[in-house]
Amino acid sequence: MVYVQYLLQIIAALGIFNVWLLRFGQDTEYRGGKASNMSEEFLVYGLPIVAVYIIGFLKIMSAIGLLAGIFLQWFVIPSAILLAALMIGAFGMHLKIKDPFKKSIPALIMLALCVAILLLAA
């Protein structure tokens, strides 16, 4: 089962890197409201622009922690908990602005990955 956990950690980390490093400035069908990039999305949510960088830092550090957890197990649980909390927040933001459910799916999938990682790591 440990290899399943590692696979989920890698998938979650790569997903975060994809969204926050590769697609940060790109329009996607999952952006909140009518935002065309990450900074606009946070403004749509009513958050200050500095929140983009704080949340981004936390998500990227969580992803790095999940990868480091393959070698140093004690990174896994704190990283997965933090990332799960951030995904709950992301889902809440979509609800706040009454986005269609489809836009919440990536956050919910990432939340499910984090819960699975936590269950396997416990």
Can you name each region flagged by the protein language model?
Residues 1-122:
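Membrane-interface extramembranous regions
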